[in-house]
A protein has these predicted regions:
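Amphipathic alpha-helical segments enriched in hydrophobic/aromatic residues interleaved with Lys/Arg
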Residues: 2-20, 24, 139-154
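N-terminal, Lys/Arg-enriched amphipathic/low-complexity engagement segments
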Residues: 31-49
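N-terminal short leaders/motifs
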Residues: 24-37, 80-85
């Protein structure tokens, strides 16, 4: 899946009734949205780059929780980092609770995801980087990634 398709998924998600986001501005390669939730001042910025990377940043603060739903979203390879705050995710009948300092990786299609974003001490910040499997292989071939990352544990 190319970055344009992933970016279009973000546009569709932000515009959906269940996202909880209000679109602030949108171009062919940049999108900005604000949380609709009273008491929270969260913003999300998404950029699509011709290099094959899509970057999403969410930051802000306030009080309360921010529930959101994602019905279908496909990733090439995606890296998520919670910088501050917490995220409670329900995916495929399983629950995940990443918090500040945690990184998690996703690949492939996500269906019927519900998440609740929770600021810690009034703040929240998260990053999401989506890139192709080919880019991951290139980084590996260039020696940028440790070989141990690619060995399966037995």
């Amino acid at each position: 899946m190319n970055t344009a398709a992933i970016y279009r998924q973000y546009q569709t998600y932000v515009r959906s009734d269940k996202s909880g986001w209000a679109l602030d501005g949108c171009s062919d390669s940049a999108l900005m949205a604000q949380a609709k939730q009273p008491g929270l001042h969260l913003e999300m910025c998404i950029n699509r780059f011709d290099s094959g990377i899509t970057l999403s940043r969410m930051r802000g603060g306030g009080t309360g929780v921010f529930p959101t739903e994602i019905h279908n979203f496909s990733h090439n390879c995606a890296l998520f980092v919670m910088v501050s705050g917490q995220n409670q995710l329900q995916m495929g009948g399983r629950e995940y609770r990443p918090s500040a300092g945690e990184i998690w990786l996703v690949r492939g299609e996500l269906a019927d995801v519900s998440e609740t974003l929770l600021p810690d001490n009034g703040g929240m910040c998260a990053l999401h980087l989506d890139f192709s499997l080919e880019k991951l292989r290139r980084w590996h071939d260039e020696g940028l990634l440790d070989e141990r990352l690619f060995r399966r544990k037995r």
